[in-house]
Amino acid sequence: MLICVPGILSKDDVAEFRHIMDSSDWEDGRSTAGAQSAMVKRNEQLPPDSEVARKLGHRIISAMTANPRFLAAAIPQHIFPPLFNRYAADSGHHFGIHVDNAVRGDKLTGLRIRTDLSVTLFLSEPEEYDGGELVIEDLYGSHEVKLPAGDLVLYPASSLHMVTPVTRGVRIASFFWLQSMIRDPLARSMIFDLDTTIQDLSRRMGRDDPEMVRLTGLYHNLIRYWAET
Protein backbone atom coordinates (compact mmCIF):
# COMPACT_ATOMS: atom_id res chain seq x y z
CA MET A 1 0.00 0.00 0.00
CA LEU A 2 1.52 3.28 -1.17
CA ILE A 3 -0.44 6.33 -0.03
CA CYS A 4 0.24 10.01 -0.70
CA VAL A 5 -0.98 12.59 1.81
CA PRO A 6 -1.02 16.19 0.53
CA GLY A 7 -0.61 19.35 2.55
CA ILE A 8 0.93 18.06 5.76
CA LEU A 9 2.92 21.30 5.88
CA SER A 10 1.79 24.59 4.35
CA LYS A 11 4.01 26.43 1.89
CA ASP A 12 4.78 28.96 4.62
CA ASP A 13 5.80 26.14 6.97
CA VAL A 14 8.06 24.67 4.29
CA ALA A 15 9.69 28.05 3.68
CA GLU A 16 10.35 28.44 7.40
CA PHE A 17 11.78 24.92 7.63
CA ARG A 18 14.07 25.58 4.69
CA HIS A 19 15.27 28.89 6.13
CA ILE A 20 16.18 27.17 9.40
CA MET A 21 17.90 24.25 7.68
CA ASP A 22 19.86 26.52 5.33
CA SER A 23 21.73 27.90 8.34
CA SER A 24 22.25 24.49 9.98
CA ASP A 25 25.20 22.12 9.86
CA TRP A 26 24.81 18.86 7.94
CA GLU A 27 26.72 15.60 8.43
CA ASP A 28 27.37 12.41 6.47
CA GLY A 29 24.06 10.56 6.13
CA ARG A 30 25.69 7.17 6.64
CA SER A 31 25.77 7.80 10.40
CA THR A 32 22.20 6.46 10.76
CA ALA A 33 22.36 3.71 8.13
CA GLY A 34 22.62 -0.02 8.76
CA ALA A 35 25.67 -1.91 7.53
CA GLN A 36 24.14 -2.83 4.18
CA SER A 37 22.47 0.54 3.55
CA ALA A 38 25.67 2.43 4.38
CA MET A 39 27.35 0.88 1.36
CA VAL A 40 24.88 2.52 -1.04
CA LYS A 41 23.96 5.72 0.86
CA ARG A 42 25.45 9.02 -0.29
CA ASN A 43 23.73 12.04 1.20
CA GLU A 44 23.83 14.47 4.11
CA GLN A 45 21.51 14.83 7.07
CA LEU A 46 20.91 17.04 10.06
CA PRO A 47 22.43 15.48 13.19
CA PRO A 48 19.53 13.43 14.64
CA ASP A 49 20.18 14.66 18.18
CA SER A 50 20.41 18.34 17.21
CA GLU A 51 17.96 20.87 18.62
CA VAL A 52 16.96 21.89 15.09
CA ALA A 53 16.08 18.34 14.03
CA ARG A 54 14.11 17.70 17.21
CA LYS A 55 12.09 20.92 17.04
CA LEU A 56 11.24 20.54 13.36
CA GLY A 57 10.44 16.87 13.92
CA HIS A 58 7.96 17.71 16.69
CA ARG A 59 6.20 20.12 14.34
CA ILE A 60 5.92 17.45 11.66
CA ILE A 61 4.46 14.93 14.09
CA SER A 62 1.93 17.49 15.34
CA ALA A 63 0.87 18.30 11.78
CA MET A 64 0.60 14.63 10.76
CA THR A 65 -1.43 13.55 13.76
CA ALA A 66 -3.95 16.31 12.99
CA ASN A 67 -4.41 15.01 9.43
CA PRO A 68 -7.37 12.59 9.01
CA ARG A 69 -5.97 10.89 5.89
CA PHE A 70 -2.64 10.18 7.56
CA LEU A 71 -4.33 8.78 10.66
CA ALA A 72 -6.65 6.61 8.58
CA ALA A 73 -3.81 5.17 6.51
CA ALA A 74 -1.22 4.68 9.25
CA ILE A 75 -3.22 4.08 12.46
CA PRO A 76 0.01 5.00 14.26
CA GLN A 77 1.05 3.58 17.60
CA HIS A 78 4.61 4.94 17.76
CA ILE A 79 6.27 7.48 15.45
CA PHE A 80 10.05 7.61 15.25
CA PRO A 81 11.50 11.14 15.59
CA PRO A 82 11.73 12.56 12.05
CA LEU A 83 15.14 12.81 10.41
CA PHE A 84 16.14 15.21 7.64
CA ASN A 85 18.29 14.55 4.58
CA ARG A 86 19.83 16.52 1.75
CA TYR A 87 20.79 15.31 -1.73
CA ALA A 88 22.93 17.73 -3.76
CA ALA A 89 23.78 17.39 -7.44
CA ASP A 90 27.27 18.85 -6.99
CA SER A 91 28.10 16.06 -4.52
CA GLY A 92 26.70 13.21 -6.61
CA HIS A 93 24.24 12.27 -3.90
CA HIS A 94 21.94 9.24 -4.23
CA PHE A 95 20.77 6.24 -2.19
CA GLY A 96 20.99 2.85 -3.87
CA ILE A 97 18.46 0.05 -3.58
CA HIS A 98 17.98 -1.10 0.02
CA VAL A 99 15.45 -2.14 2.63
CA ASP A 100 15.00 -0.35 5.95
CA ASN A 101 15.95 -1.96 9.26
CA ALA A 102 13.11 -3.90 10.90
CA VAL A 103 13.63 -2.20 14.27
CA ARG A 104 14.79 1.36 14.97
CA GLY A 105 15.89 2.77 18.31
CA ASP A 106 16.18 6.41 19.35
CA LYS A 107 19.12 7.08 21.66
CA LEU A 108 17.67 10.23 23.21
CA THR A 109 14.24 8.89 24.17
CA GLY A 110 14.93 5.16 24.38
CA LEU A 111 12.02 4.55 22.00
CA ARG A 112 12.27 1.30 20.01
CA ILE A 113 9.77 0.59 17.26
CA ARG A 114 8.98 -2.08 14.72
CA THR A 115 9.16 -0.28 11.38
CA ASP A 116 5.84 -1.07 9.71
CA LEU A 117 5.68 2.01 7.49
CA SER A 118 8.30 4.33 6.03
CA VAL A 119 7.49 8.00 5.53
CA THR A 120 9.07 10.60 3.25
CA LEU A 121 7.93 14.22 3.59
CA PHE A 122 9.17 16.34 0.69
CA LEU A 123 10.62 19.77 1.54
CA SER A 124 11.81 20.75 -1.97
CA GLU A 125 9.49 21.52 -4.88
CA PRO A 126 9.84 19.12 -7.86
CA GLU A 127 11.06 21.91 -10.13
CA GLU A 128 13.95 22.71 -7.76
CA TYR A 129 15.89 19.61 -8.73
CA ASP A 130 16.29 16.93 -11.40
CA GLY A 131 16.50 13.28 -10.48
CA GLY A 132 16.01 12.44 -6.81
CA GLU A 133 12.92 10.32 -7.39
CA LEU A 134 11.96 7.96 -4.59
CA VAL A 135 11.59 4.59 -6.33
CA ILE A 136 9.59 1.96 -4.44
CA GLU A 137 9.34 -1.69 -5.49
CA ASP A 138 6.29 -3.78 -4.65
CA LEU A 139 4.33 -6.75 -6.00
CA TYR A 140 2.91 -4.59 -8.79
CA GLY A 141 6.20 -3.20 -10.05
CA SER A 142 8.24 -0.06 -9.57
CA HIS A 143 6.76 3.30 -8.53
CA GLU A 144 8.49 6.69 -8.81
CA VAL A 145 7.44 9.32 -6.28
CA LYS A 146 8.31 13.02 -6.47
CA LEU A 147 5.77 15.14 -4.60
CA PRO A 148 5.25 18.87 -4.00
CA ALA A 149 6.90 20.32 -0.90
CA GLY A 150 4.73 19.71 2.16
CA ASP A 151 3.29 16.42 0.87
CA LEU A 152 4.28 12.99 2.15
CA VAL A 153 4.19 9.38 1.00
CA LEU A 154 3.60 6.33 3.20
CA TYR A 155 4.81 2.91 2.05
CA PRO A 156 5.67 -0.46 3.64
CA ALA A 157 9.07 -0.38 5.32
CA SER A 158 9.63 -3.91 3.99
CA SER A 159 9.77 -2.54 0.42
CA LEU A 160 12.97 -2.34 -1.58
CA HIS A 161 13.45 1.33 -2.44
CA MET A 162 16.03 3.87 -3.60
CA VAL A 163 16.59 7.57 -4.30
CA THR A 164 17.90 8.18 -7.80
CA PRO A 165 20.93 10.48 -8.29
CA VAL A 166 20.17 14.19 -8.10
CA THR A 167 21.58 15.73 -11.29
CA ARG A 168 20.53 19.37 -10.74
CA GLY A 169 19.76 21.37 -7.64
CA VAL A 170 19.13 20.10 -4.13
CA ARG A 171 16.49 17.71 -2.78
CA ILE A 172 15.60 18.14 0.89
CA ALA A 173 13.18 15.88 2.74
CA SER A 174 12.25 14.46 6.11
CA PHE A 175 12.19 10.71 6.50
CA PHE A 176 11.17 8.43 9.35
CA TRP A 177 9.23 5.33 10.31
CA LEU A 178 6.24 4.36 12.37
CA GLN A 179 4.79 1.36 14.11
CA SER A 180 1.12 0.89 13.35
CA MET A 181 -1.50 -0.45 15.72
CA ILE A 182 -2.46 -2.74 12.81
CA ARG A 183 0.62 -4.88 12.23
CA ASP A 184 -0.59 -6.83 9.20
CA PRO A 185 -0.30 -4.74 6.00
CA LEU A 186 -3.29 -6.41 4.31
CA ALA A 187 -5.49 -5.79 7.34
CA ARG A 188 -4.28 -2.18 7.47
CA SER A 189 -5.08 -1.71 3.79
CA MET A 190 -8.60 -3.09 4.24
CA ILE A 191 -9.18 -0.85 7.25
CA PHE A 192 -8.09 2.17 5.21
CA ASP A 193 -10.36 1.22 2.30
CA LEU A 194 -13.29 0.77 4.69
CA ASP A 195 -12.59 4.10 6.38
CA THR A 196 -12.41 5.88 3.00
CA THR A 197 -15.69 4.27 1.91
CA ILE A 198 -17.41 5.30 5.15
CA GLN A 199 -16.26 8.90 4.73
CA ASP A 200 -17.47 9.01 1.11
CA LEU A 201 -20.84 7.45 1.91
CA SER A 202 -21.43 9.64 4.95
CA ARG A 203 -21.30 12.75 2.77
CA ARG A 204 -24.13 11.35 0.66
CA MET A 205 -26.20 9.49 3.23
CA GLY A 206 -25.48 11.34 6.46
CA ARG A 207 -23.71 9.91 9.49
CA ASP A 208 -26.97 9.07 11.25
CA ASP A 209 -28.16 6.73 8.48
CA PRO A 210 -28.68 3.23 10.02
CA GLU A 211 -26.44 1.56 7.42
CA MET A 212 -23.72 4.11 8.11
CA VAL A 213 -23.95 3.35 11.81
CA ARG A 214 -23.52 -0.37 11.07
CA LEU A 215 -20.53 0.25 8.80
CA THR A 216 -18.91 2.48 11.41
CA GLY A 217 -19.46 -0.22 14.00
CA LEU A 218 -17.82 -2.75 11.68
CA TYR A 219 -14.82 -0.43 11.27
CA HIS A 220 -14.29 -0.10 15.00
CA ASN A 221 -14.82 -3.80 15.65
CA LEU A 222 -12.21 -4.73 13.03
CA ILE A 223 -9.72 -2.36 14.64
CA ARG A 224 -10.60 -3.87 18.01
CA TYR A 225 -9.94 -7.34 16.56
CA TRP A 226 -6.60 -6.50 14.90
CA ALA A 227 -5.12 -3.69 16.99
CA GLU A 228 -2.02 -4.13 19.13
CA THR A 229 -1.60 -1.56 21.88
Curated annotation (Swiss-Prot):
Co-factor: note: Binds 1 Fe(2+) ion per subunit.
Presence of the UniProt keyword Repeat in the record: no
Entry GO MF terms: 2-oxoglutarate-dependent dioxygenase activity; iron ion binding; L-ascorbic acid binding
Enzyme class label: oxidoreductase
The UniProt record lists the keyword Nucleotide-binding: no
Cofactor(s), by name: Fe(2+); L-ascorbate
EC number: 1.14.11.-
Residues binding 2-oxoglutarate, per UniProt: 171
Ranges for domain Fe2OG dioxygenase: 78-180
InterPro entries given in the database record: Oxoglu/Fe-dep_dioxygenase_dom (IPR005123), PKHD_C (IPR041097), PKHD_hydroxylase (IPR023550), Pro_4_hyd_alph (IPR006620), Pro_4_hyd_alph_FE2OG_OXY (IPR044862)
Residues involved in Fe cation binding: 98, 100, 161
Gene Ontology BP term (one): DNA damage response
Keyword list, A-Z: Dioxygenase, Iron, Metal-binding, Oxidoreductase, Vitamin C
Recorded superkingdom: Bacteria
Protein name according to UniProt: PKHD-type hydroxylase BBta_1313
Organism: Bradyrhizobium sp. (strain BTAi1 / ATCC BAA-1182)
